[in-house]
Amino acid sequence: MFKAFIALLILLIVCWVIQLLPVIAVPFTTPDANIYLSYYNNYKFGVFGICNVERHICSKPSIGYPSTNSTFYAYDNDESFGTGGIVLPSDVRYTISKLLVVHVVAFCFSSLLLIVIFGLIIILFFKYIKTKKDLEGIQLNDSSHEITIHSDEEDNNNNNIDNTNHNNKRASVTINKTIFDLTPFLNLMLVFTFFSVLTTLLAFLADILLFTPNLSYLGWLQLIPIVSMALVTSMLCFIKRSISSRKFFESEYRYANDDMRIMRKTYVDEFWNDNASDDGFYVYTDGFYTRNGDNVQQPTSNTAGSLLSEHHDVSIVEPRTFLDTDDSRRGSSPHEFIELQNLRPV
């Protein structure tokens, strides 16, 4: 279980880094940096603004690209702006650029998910250390009780054995009761992964809608968090299912509908017990040979020639040897058999 959470942590760190790149794109980085969602008409587009590559002028970070009355156009007077502000690669209006804020929402959900799983791993690590120390203490108590047992008398030995068994049972019960319940954390992680997948998918669709002819590598990289988050969701569901099944089978209480536990116990018993399906019926055979005492004869083939040559009026030959009706001898020797020969009538 601990290794599974570490694998999830590594996968989430990769997704978190990929989702961080669009958030820190231009205008937070310089225009010379290779972190942008699209490059079109000497302009680099990010989530919170745009930058002019030639003049090294960037807009102020804001949700949505600068409108027609923005001061950005006063510093960068370009005829390509027209009357509607900045021209996007897909020729859509600049107001649709506000959809890019979904990148930030997806990044926030991934950050929360990363914090939860990192905290869960730390808690499990400390719980493992504490449980290990408790088990070592129990083993030390057992060894000390064994030393005192050898030095006492027989009556005292019995009392000490009972006390040690009672203490061991109490210690094991307390350790079992302090087992950490992962279900609330798993439910919280499932909620975060679900919303992270939805928001990352919506952000990728917004990138395609705005920059579809000139979408950069950073936009296509957003497919990796989508697939990874879907994989993380499946793994979390599998872990939750395995934990709930283990708790159900290891529970000491009986339930009203306990068919699942009974079926599992029956299957395990039949799997480990070789005599589980034994009904007392034995079949002895020598393959395709006929044994008469110590003489072994191969059977004759019932061909048409042999049937014509060995023609009889009866179709069934009387058995040579019958099994004894005595119960004490029934099935005692594999040499006792009934030999029958099938003859076809002419």
From Swiss-Prot:
GO cellular component: cell division site; growing cell tip; plasma membrane
Classification via Pfam families: SUR7 (PF06687)
Alphabetical GO biological process terms: cellular response to alkaline pH; cellular response to lithium ion; cellular response to neutral pH; cellular response to pH; cellular response to starvation; filamentous growth; filamentous growth of a population of unicellular organisms in response to neutral pH; filamentous growth of a population of unicellular organisms in response to pH
Localization in the cell: Membrane
The keyword Transmembrane helix is annotated on this UniProt entry: yes
Keywords: Membrane, Transmembrane, Transmembrane helix
Protein name: pH-response regulator protein palI/RIM9
Organism whose genome encodes this protein: Candida albicans (strain SC5314 / ATCC MYA-2876) (Yeast)
Gene it is expressed from: RIM9
